[in-house]
Amino acid sequence: LHGLGADGRDFVPIAQELDLSGVGPVRFVFPNAPEMPVTINGGYVMPAWYDILGADLTSREDERGLRASQAAIEALLEREKARGIPASRIVLAGFSQGCAVALMTGLRHAQGLAGIVGLSGYLPLAALTPAERHGANATTPVFLAHGRQDDVVPIMGAMASHAALQALGHAVEWHDYAMGHSVCEEEIGDLNQWLLRVLATD
């Protein structure tokens, strides 16, 4: 799931750098967020999974928008399962806003996923997560990664999300890198190794 103002094609170059041949055929799905006015950008209409109401991403959250995107990604997961892909072979991943939606949706999904990936983002509606998360994903592996110089989504928010997930008993692999709000080669390598582990069939 892509970030604010981007589209699904943003993830294509990253997917092309991953070598997952060791776990058999892998298919990537790159959905696009709807276009909507974004408050923090002066109401400018752009692709967004939800509205950003202010610089403090968690003090005022667009719960309606978040839940609408959760429903859209749930529908996408159901379509994939209807194609014959079991939930246990699906990894839900996102960057920035996409990270927030991936974490929110994955933790609440009613069937156990192979894993959840959150890059340069945070856990939204964190106070509601303990009551709303589904037991089916209580032990689902989570990969979180963030840039130490990120001035768009500060790393402190990601660290708080990491701590919250650990407190709930989730198996979280955490990485941070000397970069801003972006993705780096080392991160892709770490993600590759993690994906090989969570998708291993033996």
Task: Label every model-predicted segment.
Residues L1-V91:
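Serine-hydrolase catalytic machinery in alpha/beta-hydrolase-like enzymes
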Residues F11-Q16, P130, P154-A164:
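Short alpha-helix in the alpha/beta-hydrolase fold that links the catalytic acid
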Residues L18-G24, G84, H109-G112, Q166-H170, ...:
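Short helix-capping segments at alpha-helix termini
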Residues P31-E35, G121, M179:
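Active-site loop/turn elements of alpha/beta-hydrolase fold enzymes
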Residues K81, P86-N137:
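Primarily recognizes the serine-hydrolase "nucleophile elbow" in alpha/beta-hydrolase
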Residues N137-V142, L168-A171:
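Short, proline-enriched alpha-helix->beta-strand connector loops that line the catalytic pocket
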Residues F143-H146, D150:
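Short beta-strand/loop motif that positions the catalytic acidic residue
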Residues M156-D202:
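C-terminal catalytic histidine-bearing segment of alpha/beta-hydrolase fold enzymes
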